[in-house]
Structures are given as structure tokens and as C-alpha cells.
Amino acid sequence: MQYRDLRDFIRGLEQRGELKRIQVPISPVLEMTEVCDRTLRAKGPALLFEKPTGFDIPVLGNLFGTPERVAMGMGAESVSELREIGKLLAFLKEPEPPKGLKDAWSKLPIFKKVVSMAPKVVKDAVCQEVVVEGDDVDLGTLPIQHCWPGDVAPLITWGLTVTRGPNKDRQNLGIYRQQVIGRNKVIMRWLSHRGGALDYREWCEKNPGQPFPVAVALGADPATILGAVTPVPDTLSEYAFAGLLRGNRTELVKCRGSNLQVPATAEIILEGVIHPGEMAPEGPYGDHTGYYNEVDSFPVFTVERITHRQKPIYHSTYTGRPPDEPAILGVALNEVFVPILQKQFPEITDFYLPPEGCSYRMAVVTMKKQYPGHAKRVMLGVWSFLRQFMYTKFVIVTDDDINARDWNDVIWAITTRMDPKRDTVMIDNTPIDYLDFASPVSGLGSKMGLDATHKWPGETTREWGRVIVKDEAVTRRIDELWDQLGID
């Protein structure tokens, strides 16, 4: 089922028993985090806090707190269906030439559907039903969460940031956390390689000293939100991809103060600029690692205008030691990644990002090994093929007889098929998440690959061990006798 906007999604969740309305007053300061954390760990519903303490605007939390709700937001009926979305993205990322006329005709509907999902620009939009400008702008009217005791200030977490570099037709969508530092100012914490930061850098080079337009959408429809965190090919805009997920074109509206286009059905829009050179120290904040991060300087976003729907809903989350929403998103999007990786590396049988590895810091790959050194090729491919994995610190590669999602299997493979010196690959001076305080230099560190595959001639001179396999006939006989044995 597809959802036109966030409210449509809320209704759909409520009909399925996947959303709970909270009538008891709960504070955005620490209390919502506690409630959402307990609910997420219990695999509970999305939460709509209708009476946040001190505010008139309800808060939506734990929206993507289960993989099943992530799948619903992407228009799928089950998590397993996300593999089909991954296959579509794999095809769009590297479309193969048709093998003949019949093949060309079979692929034509896919391209026609992609072309037909170009965003639709509208003149009037519900996200601009109410307009607040100038001195009336006050972020303090929004129930922005203060998530952890050591957090320095309230933090906008689910803001969909819209930017466009100079001479670019395509807008960039990214989700960057934003520290509130005044009634109309937040710190835009984007890393140097992210799309928003690249757009800003190019703008400063081409338009020195000129303010850089930015917009932030809060409470967009689920397909647009999830499109911003999915590995969409560079040839496809996030808005068009959201249209494919939703089954109809994404409606956009031009901002009141710039040429940026924002989701027309979003709940709240922040419009404004970044003045080149205006920076501020950001943090500390508790983040998805389970620790407070160090303080660092990032650009300041000045909010010149807030537009919103009548009676808006504020969409929020928290990040902390897994499990949290980013970890759950990682579990669901894992199914999207598998076909994309298999398109480039057909020998891969499964790919798994353990949620306890902070969503992306460790990957386990199983493969059909075909030659000596094959595992190392796959390791390097994982690190380089998708930008989502440039911060993955550990890649474990093993054979397809191992269940990548079962640590009992994985640890057995590591301890029996690896020699630490021969089978460990170390790569130094590579990009690392700025939030990773374990790296010796901020943003720069090392990576480790573990080859836990059976070794081939050329990789070892010794006779390799054979896996013990039970006798099937004996297993069947004991199955038949088991109840008579009275053991359980």
C-alpha cells in the first residue's frame, strides 16, 4: 500500500494496530526518549504524543521502530519484498543493454515508469497553509526533543535537508542533525562528503560571500523520507524514487524565499540561508554509537521563514546505542543492499549489517568462492562500490555454508578458517565517520577485512579440514525413534 503523506501513513498504521496515541502529557526533554526506547526494544508501535508538555504541536516518534514499518513506508507488504526494490535499484544503477528485441520490450515498461515518476510542481501546497516570517520565527514553538542528559541543546533529528549546487538541475536530499542555538538558528551538521556539504562548498566557490539557500522539511511522506536514506543511483532523483515507491509522482512546491522545491505535503518547512563563514561549535550529543561525540564546528543555518500545515505534526527520533531507529532502518535497508551488491558481485549469496554494529560499521558477507584471493576482492568491492559503506570498519567474508545472520556460525568460521596474519587485511588512512572517536584522527582511520573462507591451493600448503556432516539415514532413524527415548 502507498501513502500520500505522513497523515495517510499514520492512519494506515493505526488501522493495523501499529500506532498508539499517547494522551498522557510527556515532555520532549528526556521523557520521550525513555518512552520511545522502551517501546522500540519491545518491538512496539509508532507513538503519537498528542499532549507534549509545554507545546501544542503533537510529536510522532518511533515511526520506523520495526523493519516491518520501514517496509510499509516503502510501499512493501513485507521486509522480504524490499529485495525487489533492491533489484530495481540495481537495474537502474547499471542497466544492461537488451539482449534482443524481446528483452528490449520487456525492459521498456521499467524505463517508462521511471520517466513518468518525475516530480510534479504545484502552486498551492498544504505545507504553506501557515507562514511565519521575520521576527515571528521562533523554533522554540516546536516540540524539539532534548534526547539525553548530556546533550547540549534540543536537536532536530528527522529534518530532510534540501540543497542545490550551482548550475545543478537536481536537488540533493539529506538527513543531517541540527542543533538549536537560537530562536532562528541551528547548526547544520553535515560531513564533508555528503551531498549538502558538497553543494555548499561549490556554491561558496562560485558565489563567494553570498548566502546559500537551504530548506528543511519535517514530516514528509514516508517514501520521500526513506528515499533520502536509500542508495538511489545518481541518475535518479530521490523525489522520483519516492514516486516509484509511492506509485504516484512526488508533489513539490517552490519555497517562498528561494527556488528550492520542497515536498508539498510535508508538515513543517524551515526556509533560510547559510551565510558563508558563519560557524558554531556543535555538540556534544549522544549518538548512534551509544556515546557522546566530541565538539566540532559546522555551518549555521539561519531560519528566515517557517511554513506549515494547519495543526502540524512534528516528526522526531533519538539516536543511541543499538537498537535505535537508525539500527532498525539498517536492518530493513539491508534487504535493499543485497541485490545491488549481487549485481556487481554475483558470487555474493548474502550480506548482513549487524544492528549491534551501529548500522554500518561491520558487514558480514557470504559468497561462493571461486579462486584464491577471491575474498579479498569482495572486501575491497564492499568498501568501494556503494558510498553507504565507505565508513564500514570491519568486513567479514566467509563461505556460503555459513549463515551471515547467525553469530554462532560466523564466529565458528572466523576461529576455524582464519590465520590472523595471513587472512587479515588492514587498510590505513581511509575515510571514517567523524563520530568514531576510536580513530586516531577525526574522519581518518583504518579498516579491517577478515577472510574466513576455506583456503584454496595457493593460499595454504596444508591439507584443509573437511566439515563434519551427519549421516542422513541415521538422522532420519533417530527422528523416528525420538519420542520413544523419553529425553524431552
Curated annotation (Swiss-Prot):
Reaction(s) the record says it catalyses: a 4-hydroxy-3-(all-trans-polyprenyl)benzoate + H(+) = a 2-(all-trans-polyprenyl)phenol + CO2
Cofactor note: Binds 1 prenylated FMN per subunit.
An example Gene Ontology CC term for this record: cytosol
Biological pathway: Cofactor biosynthesis; ubiquinone biosynthesis
Pfam family, one: UbiD
Keywords: Cell membrane, Decarboxylase, Flavoprotein, FMN, Lyase, Manganese, Membrane, Metal-binding, Ubiquinone biosynthesis
Active-site annotation: D287
Cofactor: prenylated FMN; Mn(2+)
Binding site for prenylated FMN: I175, Y176, R177, R189, W190, L191, R194, G195
Annotated Mn(2+) binding sites: N172, E238
Locations listed in the record: Cell membrane
E.C. designation(s): 4.1.1.98
Membrane topology designation: Peripheral membrane protein
Presence of keyword S-adenosyl-L-methionine: no
GO MF annotation list: 3-octaprenyl-4-hydroxybenzoate carboxy-lyase activity; metal ion binding
Gene Ontology terms describing biological process: ubiquinone biosynthetic process
Subunit structure: Homohexamer.
Membership in a protein family: Belongs to the UbiD family.
Record function comment: Catalyzes the decarboxylation of 3-octaprenyl-4-hydroxy benzoate to 2-octaprenylphenol, an intermediate step in ubiquinone biosynthesis.
HAMAP family: UbiD
Name the record gives this protein: 3-octaprenyl-4-hydroxybenzoate carboxy-lyase
Organism: Pseudomonas putida (strain ATCC 47054 / DSM 6125 / CFBP 8728 / NCIMB 11950 / KT2440)
Lineage: Bacteria, Pseudomonadati, Pseudomonadota, Gammaproteobacteria, Pseudomonadales
